Design a protein with these regions (language model features):
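PRPP-associated nucleotide enzymes
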Residues: 1-235
Length: 235
């Protein structure tokens, strides 16, 4: 399974590179820098296809988990800064293409882009190895509500502006499918609801999603966190 995932990630990087060359054949990318760790293979393949350098520009604190599933926006913002430390030498005076496996809330990439700028990057582009995540997951991953997803209701240009990137590119959903299907004749379909909003089980309706939204929303989590802090301070 690990080798299959590695091959899939490599294909995703290659497909992204091909899309970049179609959209920006005269691109000015100096270096590709992955967001550790899950985008490393895709980033290497992307850099190779573009014929540019691949560099590790962030040092990772491995005691901090995935930020997009952390409860509360305050905790996520704090954790991003604790999790990654930039290496200024890899950014100074360069046009950098940052690569991540996906963009969910936008909290992580927003801060990482600012880190790159603070480290001296001339321009900061951002590439997502997955298509825009526009809909909530209802099958076990504690992802945010639709309104908290940065891609929900926004165009690519609006997302780029929101996260502070000079340019943003996403994987095409058809390319993602082909990256996973290629070489595996047993695969004939995928669960893509976070990208296209088409849930495989018929019980997912507006009422269900509204209830899920109320339970998962950042506001409710932050209020609960605040209540716990207040209780602790009074004890």
């Amino acid at each position: 399974m690990g080798s299959e995932m590695c091959i899939r990630d490599r294909r995703q990087g290659e497909r992204l590179a091909h899309k970049i060359m179609r959209e920006r054949p005269d691109h000015d990318i100096d270096v590709v820098i992955p967001i550790p760790d899950t985008s490393r293979v895709a980033g290497q393949a992307l850099a190779h296809e573009l014929g540019v350098k691949f560099r590790e520009g962030f040092m990772k604190n491995r005691y901090i988990g995935r930020t997009f599933i952390m409860p509360g926006q305050t905790q996520r913002r704090k954790s991003v800064r604790q999790k990654l430390n930039p290496v200024p030498l890899e950014f100074e005076g360069k046009t950098v293409l940052l690569v991540d496996d996906s963009i969910v809330r936008g909290t992580t990439c927003q801060q990482i882009i600012q880190m790159a700028r603070d480290s001296g990057a001339k321009r900061v582009y951002f590439a997502s190895a997955a298509p825009p995540v526009r809909y909530p997951n209802v099958y076990g991953i504690d992802m945010p509500t639709a309104s908290e997803l940065v891609a929900h209701g926004r165009t690519i240009e609006q997302i780029s502006e929101h996260i502070g990137a000079d340019w943003l590119i996403y994987q095409e959903i058809d390319d993602l499918i082909e990256c996973s299907r290629e070489g595996n004749s047993l695969v004939d379909g995928f669960e893509l609801s976070v990208f296209d909003g088409q849930y495989q089980t018929g019980v997912i309706d507006d009422a269900y999603l509204t209830g899920l939204s109320d339970a998962r929303s950042d506001n409710s989590v932050d209020r609960a966190d605040g209540a716990l802090v207040g209780l602790h301070n009074r004890s």
